[in-house]
């Protein structure tokens, strides 16, 4: 399920507001119990919800709509608008109406969240790129022949309804009231599941974590099972021949030839740093292409695979292609980092403080501004501190998957929860209830029930490290995969990206 959480995190960057809440429910239906909503990405134990954090950049607010159903459409007001094509993506088109409707949705979210919107032209450019990326991935999944059965789709829709405390009939009524047909809703959902399946096949299945990486991770943090020294670090230098986003096939071939020529020069004994300074378009060109010492797990996956078996001073035998262009790589140096000072006391390092905690969550979004969620939870806190029952309140009001368990998250270890939640939790004594706490999931009331000191078994330490390293690699591999899909797609802009 951890892989699915990662997929959702990444896909939310390209989906319209209602789709961002719909997707977690899709995967609940596909995979059964999911990750705790508040669990940090590297954790995968309790099943208390699958709402996905909003990863925000310039355009999209960090909050989510309150319901996993479409919000009222603004498309009707454009009924007289000529539906011209603004972009061609392989064999499909994106229309001006799609672009403006999506931009309006995002602006409405920003207004609700009291966040300033970027200039309209900038917003339209960003939204158009997102629509293109969404279309590219959907087409790739369809071209790969990935199928989603009607039965799987029905389970996904049932999960959407349950998460939003609706019956299937009520969900359909909400969808149709928003202006979207039920058939369209099912089609959109099917496409997103196809994309997730493709990513699992093309990205997740190829990411591996090696025992040496786990040893290095534990050594750096002083855990049991770690080596006596610190992790091995690699100093990689690169020459980047950048390929423009809209480069033609002929341009790309010319740039590849240039990269091959630079590789031959580097392999022939030319000074790599001077070659980089003169030819690289990477951000570290002025430093001779040196990226600096990093653990292997913190290098881009393409780089790590190319240099992991090289001896210091060696140049990778082949040009490495990424979505950014062509890379010539050299392993400049390799070293063993000093061991962590805490590594000398593995017994102490393996003892951790666990917290038994429960919470009440109100998700924020267009239907629930953050200020209103704070007000409601403040009122609820007053009731509980004056004799009300926390578990009963969680069952009635919480919008997390843990609601039916009275908000219980059970015993949690350091690093298992998102930072804002964990920091607030750590300030509480057993029995205390926090003031409303804001995270990317919404607003919470947190109650600490108990604390205990416990040993973390070496096997659990290694499992934790493996999950964390895998998460880092998945993110890097996913980014590379998406850029690669984009670079291989035929994209033609038909109009200026302005209203």
UniProtKB/Swiss-Prot annotation:
It is found in: Periplasm. It catalyses: [protein]-peptidylproline (omega=180) = [protein]-peptidylproline (omega=0). Pfam families: Rotamase, Rotamase_3, SurA_N. It comes from the Bacteria. GO terms for molecular function: peptide binding; peptidyl-prolyl cis-trans isomerase activity; unfolded protein binding. Residues 231-333, 352-450 form the PpiC domain. One of its GO terms (cellular component) is outer membrane-bounded periplasmic space. Gene3D superfamilies: 3.10.50.40, Porin chaperone SurA, peptide-binding domain. Its EC number is 5.2.1.8. GO terms for biological process: Gram-negative-bacterium-type cell outer membrane assembly; protein folding; protein stabilization. Keywords: Chaperone, Isomerase, Periplasm, Repeat, Rotamase, Signal. Residues 1-36 form the signal peptide. HAMAP family: Chaperone_SurA. Chaperone involved in the correct folding and assembly of outer membrane proteins. Recognizes specific patterns of aromatic residues and the orientation of their side chains, which are found more frequently in integral outer membrane proteins. May act in both early periplasmic and late outer membrane-associated steps of protein maturation. The PPIase activity resides only in the second parvulin domain. The N-terminal region and the C-terminal tail are necessary and sufficient for the chaperone activity of SurA. The PPIase activity is dispensable for SurA to function as a chaperone. The N-terminal region and the C-terminal tail are also required for porin recognition. This is Chaperone SurA. It comes from Cupriavidus pinatubonensis (strain JMP 134 / LMG 1197) (Cupriavidus necator (strain JMP 134)). The lineage of its organism: Bacteria, Pseudomonadati, Pseudomonadota, Betaproteobacteria, Burkholderiales.
